Amino acid sequence: MQIKKAEFVKSASSMSGLPEDGRPEFAFIGRSNVGKSSLMNMLLGRKNLVKTSKKPGKTVLLNYFIVNDSFYFVDLPGYGFASRSKSEQDLWRVVIEKYLRTRKSLADIFLLIDSRHGILPNDEQMIEFLDHYQIRYTPVFTKTDKLTKTELSVAKQKNQGSFFVSAVSGEGKDQLLDYVEQTLNAGDKKE
């Protein structure tokens, strides 16, 4: 798949603020600072379209980006960042859970996992939530440029069926975009 056009559309703090045009959505979720925004920029071929930060917890809204005028990438707030107030964390948990459980136009969820650390307890909780509600998701291991060849080979053996990407080197970009295209062509939306 070739990305010809990508634009920021809107940020939303609740379900009522989400686009209502029914276009397929690919949500990016993972721990704070796992590289969601950097990965989206790499996939979209735009260095600064999606705001990035070295400081965890930068994304605090559901951020929508229209791609090729036909589908959305949705940057979700990261989980596991404790410097936010408990009430703010609880509010976001409710909004994100409702989005993941009820959004009809959600084509897939990319669950991002830092390849250096593997699946951590917060990731396990998200996987359990997604499995419990039978929500389709695709594991994507990020920051593969930080691994040695041997470490990467072991990670790929342990996590077959997952994608392995680097926003720095571009590794995995074509495979992930091909997957997006296949999903769109199959019309495989959440029922």
Where are these predicted regions, by residue range?
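Amphipathic alpha-helical transducer elements in NTP-driven molecular machines
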Residues: Q89-R93, L120, G170-K173
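Signal for well-folded cores of large energy- and translation-related assemblies
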Residues: S13, L44, E97-K104, D131, ...
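Conserved nucleotide-sensing/catalytic segment adjacent to the nucleotide-binding pocket
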Residues: N68-L106
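Canonical P-loop GTPase G-domain recognition
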Residues: I3-S16, D145-E191
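Conserved C-terminal guanine-recognition region of P-loop GTPase G domains, centered on the G4
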Residues: V94-G161
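Conserved nucleotide-binding/hydrolysis micro-motifs of P-loop NTPases
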Residues: K58, F71, G78-F81, R116-G118, ...
